Amino acid sequence: IESANEFYPFTAKQLPTTENCHVLDLGCGTGLELQEYYLLNPSAMVTGIDLSQGMLAELKRKFANKDITLMLGSYFDVPFGEEVFDAAVSVESLHHFTKGEKIKLYSKLHKALKDKGYFILTDYFSLSDDEEQVHRRNLLALKAEQGITDDEFYHYDIPLTVKHESEALVEAGFSSVVVLNNWGATYTIKAVK
């Protein structure tokens, strides 16, 4: 991914460095952002959620000596709890979902964060409303062509614009949403509870 060598370290630097803080990683994969983060905060307690057993196994192998809890499943389905996490992070994972789906997820995430907790989102976004609509139309056409129902998850990119992503976060209850940086179409957004 273009600029990954820049945005993974940048994202990690946005996470809390307080001792024994608890961080939720949505779509953690093999933990690319955690490589950088554990250098900054070796005592962090991380809960990672991912759909891939193989990626979780690799992450566990890489960080066998860290305080990490891994959950196999969809972050839409796995319970997060309430006021559990100091921060949450997601890198290049949430561009597969509609604004409505994200509002539901972000509402659940908002409840899971402690007071003054925050969410760091690094992902790629559509650069215009037209581009966002093209992605959405292409997905709908593909689903119709292949008989995929709305109940089924289909791994297809439908990135929102930064404006629409920010609106989803605000609608979910976040009080402050700011863009921290960008690399072309990839942005880092911070949303504070």
Where are these regions (language model features)?
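A short glycine-rich, Lys/Arg-flanked "PGG" loop and its adjoining helix->strand segment in the class I
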Residues: 103-115
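Short catalytic micro-motifs in class I SAM-dependent methyltransferases
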Residues: 92-93
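Conserved alpha-helix/loop element of class I SAM-dependent methyltransferases that forms part
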Residues: 2-19, 36
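C-terminal alpha-helical "lid/dimerization" subdomain adjacent to the S-adenosyl-L-methionine
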Residues: 122-172, 178
